[in-house]
């Protein structure tokens, strides 16, 4: 099924965003684990896998529309050197996704591609949850202070 070139461009642009997020979140999770924040690392790793599922769905859609998924391009990774920097960097990606997808959904509807619009809406719903999580972590860090927040994230050895 031949897809609209503009819709395919939007799909590939979002694919680039998802591939970038996969890498950034995965590296952040490995750094968090290395710092001893095991539970936090598990959550961040799960977010990376969520982005992988988005990339898979987008890839499937591009292929169905007779397009070619571009796996050779990434946006710049923003690797935080502290938990705060990581949360802020991950939040920036999520805000960019929202800014990209909201007009993309409208364009897909105008092009009468409700399936791609629905896919983008599902991604927006997932990203809203991730934004809420990241904003909450930053708020907790502000309320508790970095030291107390970090202490709450440290894994305790089994007794």
UniProtKB/Swiss-Prot annotation:
Protein name: Bacterioferritin
Annotated PANTHER family: BACTERIOFERRITIN
GO MF: ferric iron binding; ferroxidase activity; heme binding
Protein family according to the UniProt entry: Belongs to the bacterioferritin family.
Biological-process GO terms, alphabetical: intracellular iron ion homeostasis; iron ion transport
Annotated signal sequence range: none
Top-rank EC class of the record's enzyme: oxidoreductase
EC number in record: 1.16.3.1
Organism: Mycolicibacterium paratuberculosis (strain ATCC BAA-968 / K-10) (Mycobacterium paratuberculosis)
Protein residues bound to Fe cation 2: 51, 94, 127, 130
Function: Iron-storage protein, whose ferroxidase center binds Fe(2+), oxidizes it using dioxygen to Fe(3+), and participates in the subsequent Fe(3+) oxide mineral core formation within the central cavity of the BFR protein shell.
Pfam families: Ferritin (PF00210)
InterPro entries, per database record: Bacterioferritin, Ferritin-like, Ferritin-like_diiron, Ferritin-like_SF, Ferritin_DPS_dom
GO cellular component, one term: cytosol
């Amino acid at each position: 099924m031949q897809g609209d070139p503009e819709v395919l461009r939007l799909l590939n642009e979002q694919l680039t965003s998802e591939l970038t997020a996969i890498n950034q979140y995965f590296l952040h999770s490995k750094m968090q684990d290395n710092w001893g924040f095991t539970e936090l690392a598990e959550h961040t790793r799960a977010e990376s896998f969520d982005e992988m599922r988005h990339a898979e769905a987008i890839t499937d859609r591009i292929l169905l529309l007779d397009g070619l998924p571009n796996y050779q391009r990434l946006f710049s990774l923003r690797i935080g050197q502290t938990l705060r920097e990581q949360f802020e960097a991950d939040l920036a990606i999520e805000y960019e996704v929202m800014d990209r997808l909201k007009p993309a959904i409208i364009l897909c509807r105008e092009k009468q591609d409700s399936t791609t619009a629905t896919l983008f809406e599902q991604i927006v719903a997932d990203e809203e949850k991730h934004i809420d999580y990241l904003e909450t972590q930053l708020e907790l860090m502000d309320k508790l202070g970095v030291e107390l927040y970090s202490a709450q994230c440290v894994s305790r050895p089994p007794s």
